[in-house]
Amino acid sequence: MTDHPNVELFRRTYAAFTSGDFEALSEVFSEETVWHNPGRNPISGDFVGREATFAAFGKEFELSGGTYSPTVHDILANDEHIVALMHATAERDGKKLDMDYVLIFHVKDGKLVEGWDLWTDQGTVDAFWS
């Protein structure tokens, strides 16, 4: 059985994100993408447009001193959505993040048009980034 094409789309996205290849990310994110990062911390918010979304991504690496490290557990996809079961670790100002989370993407015309970052313990995530 072959993977759904949107599984491959996520794999390309993940490879570009983890290597900091924003040029490759530009190929998978719609110019009008919207990124939702819940919580009450310096990287929370609704980021409208690819440029704002990428700036939010960059801030994760900046604030963690480059230690932010996501790993993939599984990827589920259909024609309109991608759900990735994830885990992340990071260190910042003597604090450690070690937590599961879910990424949800809405896909249209082969591009990521909207995304959500959902953590198992948002309060701990807020404390880490604050």
Question: What is the role of each PLM region?
Answer:
Residues 29-30, 88-90, 103, 119:
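Short beta-strand segments enriched in hydrophobic/aromatic residues
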